[in-house]
């Protein structure tokens, strides 16, 4: 989901080297709209995050860079936050623990991780491969932790505002349902990296009263 947002947003924000046909070919062989964003394929992608966990580690590096620049040039000039959207797979990789520990050690209060906590991997329920309590894991690594409804924009915004006040890096567990709105596939691995299918799309469109044509972008 994070990677879909990344590719889609490049198109919606006007990058000229990506068009609607590229969007239609998302995650297809030889398509430049790869399943995992890769540096050099399209404009606006600054780093490859395909190996799960690498994006998290890269984000920690960016937060450290901000801290160094802020110390050198002053907070009036350099004072931004680094945000990371992470999935279950990102947190299962070994590289994530090294990055999490480093961020906690240096109290990177300019870093906020939003975890898409849906409990599903491409192989099925997360319990098949992981029993980690992620909240406890981050707490023990010197992070502030928060929880919110990942389908409620106002609650997410409120939780982020609390995280911004912390003097530690922040981890927000956003509880979500993968494939939200799909009556037959929501909450299953059937929507992890796979199309809904024509029949399910038809049902979802009816549920959301969505009468626009496929790939139409309402103004």
Task: Give the location of each predicted region.
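Hydrophobic, small-residue-rich alpha-helical packing segments that form membrane-like cores
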Residues: 55-60, 65-67, 73-85, 92-141, ...
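Long, well-ordered, tryptophan-enriched scaffold segments
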Residues: 114-219
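Alpha-helix initiation and N-capping motif
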Residues: 4, 19-23, 108, 131, ...
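Short, flexible segments with low predicted structural confidence
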Residues: 33, 109-110, 175-176
